Swiss-Prot record:
Belongs to the TNF receptor-associated factor family. A subfamily. Its main location: cytoplasm. Residues 441-450 have a biased composition (Polar residues). It comes from the Eukaryota. A zinc finger (RING-type) spans 87-134. Pfam families: MATH_2, zf-TRAF. Probable adapter protein and signal transducer that links members of the tumor necrosis factor receptor family to different signaling pathways by association with the receptor cytoplasmic domain and kinases. This is TNF receptor-associated factor family protein DDB_G0272348. InterPro entries: MATH/TRAF_dom, TRAF-like, Znf_RING/FYVE/PHD, Znf_TRAF. One of its GO terms (molecular function) is zinc ion binding.
Amino acid sequence: MEFELEDITIEQSSFTNNNSNNNNNNNNNSNSNNNNNNNNNNINNNNNHNNNNKNNSNNKNEINNQLDIPISNLVVDKENISKKYFCTICSDLLVNSFHADKFKAVQCKNGHYTTCLNCWEKHLEKKKNCIQCGVDVESIESLSSNLLVTQKFTTFKIHCPNSFFDTIDFIKDEVNGCKEIIQINELEEHLKECQYGFISCKNCEEFSKLPFQEFTQCPDFRKNTKEQHDLICPYVKISCEYCGDIINKINKESHNANWCQEITIKCLDCHLPFKKKEINQHQKSFCPETIIQCRYSKGGCNAMIRRSKLSQHLTEGDNHHQFISNILNQQDLKINELELKNTEFCLLLNGQNKKITELEILFKELNDSILIQKQQQKQQQQQQQQQQQQQQQQQQQQQSQQQQSQQQQQSQQQQQSQQSQQNNNSNSHFINNNNNNINNVQMSDSPNGGSLPQAVYKNKWVISNYSEQEQQGISKDYIKSPLFKIGNSTFFLKWFPFGKKKLNYCSIFLYKTQDDKSIIVNYYIHLVNNQISDEVYEKRGCQKYDSENGSAGYGSSQFIKRADLLNDANGFLINDSITIEIEIFATEEILPLQS
């Protein structure tokens, strides 16, 4: 079957490019359908989470159903549309879907476009060719889009989807439906403003979230009838006419009966009106018709009378004297019981106080005993330390004397060697005098390189105003001692208040000024403790200072924890001053003469 195309000019292009252009040209149509669906996205909600999830899924399905509405169901005067816009196979419109990816007329490379997209898909499942001319067609993607036909469809007149009772049977709602007839490309803007779309009841949605509520979902209604719906909706929120609380209309009777405290009710005894919040106090204290006990019921009167008759009851006869006497006797017994309990409590309290006093005395004795033991232990430790120091000093003195003796022997041997060399040189000069040759003299190394006697240095370094100098030391990291000489070398100490490596420790190092002298130093550094304490901080070491490491300092980077130093109870920081004792044994090394 062939049709004359008359004013239709067929243009071919790749499916991908034309599909992009087609989507842009028909974007309004797709968006308008989405907005129409959004107006109907509120569906039945129940009072539990699972039903809410199910309803959300139903909303999505409803949107997809509306997008699946065939254009042929909405088009106006379908019978007057030219046959060239109908599929030659299914006889439906060539473009029959609002989906953006399906709103197009497709054609083979020879320009045949007489088949709709659905029929093309069914045909290509069986044969890979054009239905009309037989040219090879590999897939839907190999077809091109006919832009002129597609654009023509955007101008077709359609009924508003909201003109029907629903989008399943497509039965016209002549009374309440939308009367607008629009072009397909105007659908989006129209649906944004259309007041005939169906919406779900918001009151039901909110009511379903309340706990322990059972309800029947209101049917969907059109937007423009929302005010009329709220007038009859049982779940609409209203204000209580008595207390002003916001409640659902369906709960009004329950609220008035069980919760509202401002509603007026009648007293069951006197039948006078009172607010519900006042009725209990009225009946308890004021209502003249309420039945109450006699005020002397504790004394034995068991009469039950109206409050208004109480005075009359009390004046009848003299029997209440006995009841009053009974009450007084009961009170006397109660007082006696309380006094007895009070006496027992006082005795118990005195016993506990006595035990507390005994425990305090025992604790003080134990504490004093512990302090005495600690002091004795500290004294013993100090005595042992002093003995050890004396022994070390004696050993050092003996070593010093031995070194001095060795140095004297080496000096004598060196002098003898020099004298012997001088004699030999003298003889050599005499023998070789005729030849006028003078031998060069080379001094040999003296034994062990030679050394001076050992020098001993003892002193104290007092750092006053420690807290102030500590703050000044922040900028240069240390506090420097005055210079002091040992033999021919000059030394000094550096105290690092915040540590050289770790901030929570104080560090101390011994330095030598730079020169060419080589010297071996045995040093002992001790932080003075001004109280009896177990804490002893000292550093001993032996180090050689020479030209290669003359600027290096030797000591301890973790000499004492800063917290221990600043703790007054430890006895190191007294009157904002610390004292450091130093004892140094230095041996200056003499290098051999060379020529």
